[in-house]
Every structure is written in structure tokens, then in C-alpha cells.
UniProtKB/Swiss-Prot annotation:
Disulfide bonds: none annotated. The record marks K29, K238 as: Transition state stabilizer. It comes from the Bacteria. Substrate binds at G64, G65, R86, N177. One of its GO terms (biological process) is L-arginine biosynthetic process. Its EC number is 2.7.2.8. Keywords: Amino-acid biosynthesis, Arginine biosynthesis, ATP-binding, Cytoplasm, Kinase, Nucleotide-binding, Transferase. It is an enzyme of class 2 (transferase). It comes from Campylobacter jejuni (strain RM1221). Pfam families: AA_kinase. This is Acetylglutamate kinase. It catalyses: N-acetyl-L-glutamate + ATP = N-acetyl-L-glutamyl 5-phosphate + ADP. Its main location: cytoplasm. Catalyzes the ATP-dependent phosphorylation of N-acetyl-L-glutamate.
Length: 279
């Protein structure tokens, strides 16, 4: 009997959060181990399907860096990185577009199998993501200039769940590879999303990444600004994205461990949460 009561308590605990976030837009940046491990991938898809079915409005932005690197190697296309960003010449950009499109359609298929009206897009569709060249040394790597969010608003209104590949275009219709974190942040700002969640390969934000007991469960925007200069590497970039989002209309940003099964549900629908809440 006790185990049944525990299950009931879990549902009751989720109720106020389901009510609070009903009809709210939730941006999810999907990447890392949660994309590479089939069991974790299925858990993420289940979480997102449940978010949708209880009345939230999720949007997924996905990456695909490791798959792009693997395909470049398989096809003999040279792939190099500068300052953590892939140098994207025309050949590399074509490979990236192909791989990201394949990932995108697989995600659409996975969610449709769970009863969700999912639709796959890239930033070129409907001129969703207009960009310019980020750096001449990076070739076709883009910086987003404008998000034409009307198409996403119309899809959400028609009960679709958009899944977006991080590919954009410039005014001359050239194709650009864009950092998926940047895409998620830009779209969240354009739609003034209730939440932006990053699925990562870390438990969250730490005061000291060498001290696993220093995990920060919640941090205000002002505290995040103070902490940001003290953090190095990829998490510094991610924290800057969190700050940018919170300063531009996104209410809360979450840094979650995508290696933990059902981390999205644990963060959004429980009192304690999991990972780090910014804002």
C-alpha cells in the first residue's frame, strides 16, 4: 500500500506546477549524453511528451556535434575547431545540414510515436533564423540577427511541437551552422518563454567545479552576474546565455543533468528540483 501512496504523492506534488505552467512556452536545448544514449533519449522524449500532454508548450532545439564529426570523418571532410566552434566551410556545412536534418526527423518520429504532433524545422524554414557570419576565420558559422518567431507562434497555436535544427541563413540565402545554445537562447528571448532548459553532461552549476559538493541549486540573476567571470570553459558560455535570456524576457533558466533519467520532470514538477535554477 505504501508504494501506491508514494505514487499518488508524486502526482499531487506535480499538480500546482502543472497548473502554474499551463499554456506556457518552454524552450529545451537537447544535447550531450541524453542524445547519444538510447535509454536516456527515450526518457527525454517521454518527459517532453508529458509536458505537452498536460498543457505546456515545449519547443526543442537540438544539437548534433558528435554525429557531425563522425560523418565528416566517414566522408573524408576535414573538420576543425577554433575556440570551441567548428570551422564550417561549404563542405562541412553541407554535412552538418544533412546530419542535423536526419537527427531532426528521428526526433519528430520519436515524439509522434508518443502521441505528440511534432514538426521538424531548421532556421532556413520560413526564414526562421536570419544570421550573419560570426567570424571570417570560422567560414559559415552564423550569429543570429533576427528570429522570425511568427511561424513558431502559429505552430504552437495549432498544437504542434516544433523541433528546430540549428541551421540559419543570411540575406543572400547562404546556409550557416549556428551554435545550438545560441539558437535556444535567441528563440526563448523572442517568444519570452517561461523557461529555458539546457540538458547538459554536468549536474548543474558549481561554485567550484573541482568541488562536487559546491553544486548551486538556485541562483539569482545578480548572483549569476557576479559568478560568471569566475567560471571558465563551456559552462562560462552557458551561464552567459542564462544571464542574457533572463535579462531579455525569459523568466527562469535551468541547467540540468541530461544523464539523469527524467531530469525535466524532476526539475519542473517537484518541490526540490534537480540541477541549477537561474533567475
Amino acid at each position: 500500500m505504501q508504494k501506491y501512496l508514494e505514487k499518488a504523492n508524486v502526482l499531487i506534488e506535480a499538480l500546482p506546477y502543472i497548473r502554474k505552467f499551463n499554456s506556457k512556452i518552454i524552450l529545451i536545448k537537447y544535447g550531450g549524453s541524453a542524445m547519444e544514449n538510447e535509454e536516456l533519449k527515450h526518457c527525454v522524449m517521454q518527459d517532453i511528451a508529458l509536458l505537452k500532454l498536460v498543457g505546456l508548450k515545449p519547443i526543442i532545439v537540438h544539437g548534433g556535434g558528435k554525429d557531425i564529426s563522425a560523418m565528416c570523418e566517414k566522408l573524408g571532410v576535414k573538420s576543425e575547431f577554433k575556440n570551441g566552434l567548428r570551422v564550417s566551410d561549404k563542405a562541412t556545412t553541407e554535412v552538418a545540414s544533412m546530419v542535423l536534418n536526419h537527427i531532426n526527423k528521428n526526433l519528430v518520429h520519436s515524439l509522434q510515436n508518443l502521441g505528440v504532433k511534432a514538426i521538424g524545422l531548421c532556421g532556413k524554414d520560413g526564414a526562421l533564423l536570419e544570421c550573419v557570419k560570426k567570424d571570417e576565420n570560422l567560414a559559415f558559422v552564423g550569429t543570429i540577427q533576427k528570429v522570425n518567431s511568427k511561424i513558431l507562434e502559429e505552430l504552437l497555436e495549432k498544437d504542434f511541437l516544433p523541433i528546430i535544427a540549428p541551421i540559419g541563413m543570411d540575406e543572400n540565402f547562404n546556409t550557416y551552422n549556428i551554435n545550438a545554445d545560441d539558437v535556444a537562447c535567441a528563440i526563448a528571448k523572442a517568444l519570452r518563454a517561461e523557461k529555458l532548459a539546457f540538458l547538459t553532461d554536468t549536474a548543474g552549476l558549481y561554485e567550484d567545479f573541482n568541488d562536487k559538493n559546491s553544486l548551486i541549486s538556485k541562483i539569482s540573476l545578480e548572483q549569476a552576474k557576479i559568478l560568471a567571470p569566475k567560471i571558465e570553459g563551456g559552462m562560462h558560455v552557458k551561464l552567459k546565455s542564462c544571464i542574457d535570456a533572463c535579462e531579455n524576457g525569459v523568466k527562469k533558466v535551468h541547467i540540468l543533468d541530461g544523464r539523469v533519467k527524467h531530469s525535466l520532470l524532476l526539475e519542473f514538477f517537484t518541490d526540490e528540483g534537480i540541477g541549477t535554477l537561474v533567475g
